[in-house]
C-alpha cells in the first residue's frame, strides 16, 4: 500500500474494515496467544513446529492489524448522498451493455481497497473503472482488456 495515499471507501467498505480489525484484535489475537501458550507448554520451543506456526501467524495478524489501522487513518469516506448520478464516480452503480457480447452488466465503482470482482465491485484504478469514471448515460467507452479491446455503452447510473 502506498505510504501517503488516501484510502477511498464507501460506508459499507469502512464497516467491513472496522469489523475485520475488531475481529483480529479481540478474537484472533486471543486464539493465537492461547496456541503459543500451549506450544510453550510442550517444552523445548527450539524444535517446536506448533510454536513456530503460531508465532508466524501472530506476525501475519499483527501486520494485517497495522495495515488496517493505517488504511482507516487515511480513509476518505464517500457519502452516498454526494454521489452524482449524472456521471460515473466512485460509489456509482453503473449498468453497462458490453457491446462485444451484447450482455448487460452492473458494476459498482469503489476504491481499490474495496474492490471485489466476484461481487462486481471494481476499482476506480482498474482498466474498466478508469474508463467508466466521468462518463454519462449514452456514452460508449473502449476498454483495453487482456484479450484486446471491448466497448461498453453506459445505460444507467445510480447510487
Swiss-Prot record:
InterPro entries: GreA/GreB_C_sf, TF_GreA/GreB_CS, Tscrpt_elong_fac_GreA, Tscrpt_elong_fac_GreA/B, Tscrpt_elong_fac_GreA/B_C, Tscrpt_elong_fac_GreA/B_fam, Tscrpt_elong_fac_GreA/B_N, Tscrpt_elong_fac_GreA/B_N_sf. GO terms for biological process: DNA-templated transcription elongation; regulation of DNA-templated transcription elongation. One of its GO terms (molecular function) is RNA polymerase binding. Gene3D superfamilies: Transcription elongation factor, GreA/GreB, C-terminal domain, Transcription elongation factor, GreA/GreB, N-terminal domain. Pfam families: GreA_GreB, GreA_GreB_N. Keywords: Coiled coil, DNA-binding, Transcription, Transcription regulation. SUPFAM superfamilies: FKBP-like, GreA transcript cleavage protein, N-terminal domain. Residues 5-77 form a coiled coil. Belongs to the GreA/GreB family. Necessary for efficient RNA polymerase transcription elongation past template-encoded arresting sites. The arresting sites in DNA have the property of trapping a certain fraction of elongating RNA polymerases that pass through, resulting in locked ternary complexes. Cleavage of the nascent transcript by cleavage factors such as GreA or GreB allows the resumption of elongation from the new 3'terminus. GreA releases sequences of 2 to 3 nucleotides. This is Transcription elongation factor GreA. It comes from Alkaliphilus oremlandii (strain OhILAs). The lineage of its organism: Bacteria, Bacillati, Bacillota, Clostridia, Peptostreptococcales.
Amino acid at each position: 500500500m502506498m505510504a501517503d495515499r488516501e484510502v477511498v471507501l464507501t460506508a459499507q467498505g469502512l464497516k467491513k474494515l472496522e469489523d475485520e480489525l475488531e475481529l483480529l484484535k479481540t478474537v484472533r489475537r486471543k486464539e493465537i496467544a492461547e496456541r503459543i501458550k500451549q506450544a510453550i507448554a510442550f517444552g523445548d520451543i527450539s524444535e517446536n513446529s506448533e510454536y513456530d506456526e503460531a508465532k508466524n501467524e501472530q506476525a501475519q495478524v499483527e501486520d494485517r492489524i497495522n495495515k488496517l489501522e493505517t488504511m482507516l487513518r487515511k480513509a476518505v469516506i464517500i457519502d452516498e448522498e454526494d454521489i452524482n448520478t449524472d456521471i460515473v464516480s466512485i460509489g456509482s452503480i453503473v449498468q453497462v451493455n458490453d457491446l462485444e457480447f451484447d450482455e448487460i452488466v452492473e458494476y459498482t465503482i469503489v476504491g481499490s481497497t474495496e474492490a471485489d470482482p466476484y461481487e462486481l465491485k471494481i476499482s476506480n484504478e482498474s482498466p474498466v473503472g478508469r474508463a467508466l469514471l466521468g462518463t454519462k448515460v449514452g456514452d460508449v467507452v473502449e476498454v483495453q482488456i487482456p484479450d484486446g479491446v471491448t466497448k461498453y455503452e453506459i445505460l444507467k447510473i445510480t447510487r
